[in-house]
Amino acid sequence: MLRYTLTEQLIHGMEVSNLAYDLARELGYEKEICYELAKAGVLHDIGKVVLENYVEEQDTLVVEEMRFVRTHPTLGYELLQGRGYSDFVLESILYHHENYDGTGYPANLAGEKIPFGARILRICDVYCALTSDRPYRSAFTQEQAMELMAEEVKNFDLKMFLAFQRVIHSGSRKAIELSDVDELIREIIKEKTENGIKEETGYRNERYFTERNGNP
């Protein structure tokens, strides 16, 4: 059975957010674009919250988990529409699983046809996934993760990947404030609590976000 806890999505989202901001800055994008990428980073997997609810409601249904996993970018895109986020943020989220060689999803876009925000998120998302513990494996070290990504570099924009290597080894990264995203996350926590789906770690979810981004 699939399970995506809100705690896991918050932590992963913040890690991707900060890396996306730093990578955009390393690539020379203006501050506003870097900030927009930080928003997209923290929300890029928000569709998994919807996915969790759907799968948990289908307790007796046998599902092909990968098929459902691959719907999360579209679910996230749809969830965030009408909430005041820019087209840039929404498209970055929708296409963050597209591979540079055209083998990704949901639209099999390739090369420059993939929005540059999505290309940035792709790199940061993969790195954060590799350097995090999973039920079936321990986290890879920074060096191991970069080696694995280099072996699959066809999936990434090469210029961005080289810039990402510089970011990872710079040692000058720091967390940034995203107060409007903070409010959305709090809304989702509130909705899940009211619907009786609150995790036992729910309080720590909010505390983690507040500590990393300042008081609301």
Language model: regions and residue ranges:
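Histidine- and acidic-residue-rich, metal-dependent catalytic cores
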Residues: 1-212
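Short, low-complexity N-terminal regulatory "tails/caps" that precede and couple sensory modules
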Residues: 215-216
